Design a protein with these regions (language model features):
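Basic phosphate/pyrophosphate-binding loop/patch that engages nucleotide-derived ligands
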Residues: 9-17, 218-227
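Glycine-rich beta-alpha loop elements in corrinoid/cobalamin-binding modules
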Residues: 1-30, 238
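Flexible glycine/acidic-rich beta-alpha junction loops that bind and position SAM and/or redox cofactors
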Residues: 58, 107-109, 168-173, 203-211, ...
Length: 374
């Protein structure tokens, strides 16, 4: 919108605004202004956002990022990031900040030499007012210096597209950073550096065997990825996957656009009913209290936070804790597993008790979402 919004506003003022505005060039995000946070009530938000870069150097068949933002990451200058952090701080924001990049580590050199050192200095000067989280490819695990800098800057969580434990499916979708890799070891290494891994998983690839649903469950449980976002493969318009399926006459007239409702917009090789049934089984299993709480324990055994900030517990957090204890500890069917985890955390990992409770509460939400899948 950096390039076309001024054109729209000019036409709007003249009373001749068009329905669609397009640009042939990628916008220069070095010209992106600092958001006017004063336009919203910051107290109504649990986290807020900053964007450092756009674009991703990889070309996965199902992904439309390179269509929307290109495959050559474009970044802001460190002065822009500092200015945006200042703006949030001056508005009184304290808490989570999500770097909403397509792939935060798309330009590692600049990130390590300029951007992260600037964030580290800023956050130390301000006494660690924020915790950061972002999205990155699995090859983050290959760069210990980068993981160390992210931890020092205050990053404590990262979303990673795992997609599938099936090597043939990774080859099929051209998921280059995931191929020929011990994905389980990579996840545990990232978490060892104090970065909680949230994982994205996909079922429905042509190369998926019928055993893929069990394989996904097994991998998720062993990895300790507490927040495992499993979806059915979708073919967004203009992607290479969309074009291939169109040529194979496998596209369906329309799709919901929601890859977590069990539906898709093409005819899968394993059959639509088999895929939908298997997907629901995966989601129901991984978010059942027993399996979900076991993953929290696995995660906490691996997790070694390195940042200097402390998890701050607010009055709202305490109220949520009391309410959740009543619902999860007394009313829910899986309450025995709840109390086992609470006792285990207090005995084995007491310093992680606030984090454990936060993950427990999130799990309740995930179960409610899973129940809506038909």
């Amino acid at each position: 919108a950096e390039d076309i919004l001024p054109l729209f506003l000019e036409d709007l003022e003249k009373g001749c605004a068009k329905h669609i505005y397009t640009s042939e060039e990628w916008p220069d995000i070095k010209k992106t202004p600092v958001p006017l946070w004063s336009l919203i009530d910051m107290k109504k938000y649990q986290s807020t956002t900053i964007q450092y870069s756009r674009g991703c150097p990889f070309d996965c068949e199902f992904c439309d990022i390179i269509i929307l933002n290109g495959n050559r990451p474009r970044t802001k200058d460190k002065s822009q990031i500092v200015a945006e952090l200042d703006a949030l701080y001056d508005m009184g924001w304290r808490g989570g900040v999500f770097f909403v990049d397509d792939n935060f580590i798309g330009n590692k050199r600049k990130l390590k030499s300029e951007t992260l050192p600037a964030i580290i200095k800023w956050t130390e000067d301000k006494k660690h007012p924020f915790s950061f989280f972002t999205e990155a490819s699995i090859n983050l695990a290959d760069d210990e210096e980068l993981m160390g800098l992210m931890g020092e800057a205050g990053f404590d969580m990262v979303f990673v597209g795992i997609e599938s434990p099936n090597e043939e499916s990774l080859v099929e979708c051209n998921k280059l950073p995931n191929k020929n890799r011990d994905l389980l070891a990579s996840v545990k290494k990232i978490q060892h550096y104090g970065l909680q891994v949230q994982g994205g998983f996909i079922v429905g690839f042509d190369s998926d065997p019928l055993s893929i649903f069990k394989s996904q469950i097994d991998f998720i449980q062993k990895s300790g990825i507490v927040t495992a976002m499993v979806g059915v493969l979708m073919a967004p318009p203009q992607t290479r996957l969309y074009q291939r399926l169109k040529e194979e006459n496998r596209l369906l007239p329309k799709g919901s656009g929601d890859n977590t409702d069990g539906s898709t917009n093409f005819i899968p090789k394993m059959g639509r009913e088999t895929l939908a049934r298997g997907y629901k089984h995966v989601v129901d299993t991984i978010y059942a209290p027993k399996q979900y709480y076991e993953r929290i324990k696995t995660f906490l055994r691996e997790y070694k936070p390195g940042n200097k900030g402390k998890l701050k517990v607010s009055l709202l957090d305490l109220i949520a804790l009391i309410r959740s204890t009543w619902v999860l500890g007394f009313k829910e069917k899986g309450r025995i597993h709840y109390w086992k985890l609470v006792v285990w955390t207090l005995l084995k990992k007491p310093k992680f008790f606030p984090l454990s409770m936060m993950l427990i509460i999130q799990g309740f939400h995930f179960r409610k979402v899973a129940e809506k899948i038909r």
